[in-house]
Curated annotation (Swiss-Prot):
One annotated GO molecular function: toxin activity
Organism: Scolopendra viridicornis nigra (Brazilian giant centipede)
Keywords for the protein's UniProt record, in alphabetical order: Disulfide bond, Neurotoxin, Secreted, Toxin
Sequence segments annotated as region (Disordered): 26-45
Name recorded for this polypeptide: Scolopendra 20417.15 Da toxin
Family, similarity comment: Belongs to the CRISP family. Venom allergen 5-like subfamily.
PTM annotation: Contains 3 disulfide bonds.
Other facts noted in the record for this chain: Shows similarity with the venom allergen 5 from wasps. This similarity may explain why patients with allergies to centipede venom also display allergic reaction to wasp, honey bee and/or yellow jacket venom.
Gene3D superfamilies, A to Z: CAP
Main subcellular location of this protein, as a coarse class: secreted
Expression sites (tissue/organ): Expressed by the venom gland.
Localization of this protein: Secreted
One of the record's GO cellular component terms: extracellular region
Length: 45
């Protein structure tokens, strides 16, 4: 088996980052059970 490609393309990276930022935003807003809200949690870009 020969590896042809590795890593994520730009579209996959953007989708992963958007999902991560959405989860961080829920925590920051205090919408995630068991997690305190954040006063200053910036998005990743």
């Amino acid at each position: 088996c020969q590896m042809v490609e590795r890593g994520l393309d730009a579209k996959a990276k953007a989708a992963m980052l958007d999902a991560h930022d959405x989860a961080r935003q829920k925590v920051a807003n205090g919408q995630e059970a068991g997690q305190p809200g954040a006063x200053n949690m910036k998005e990743l870009h």
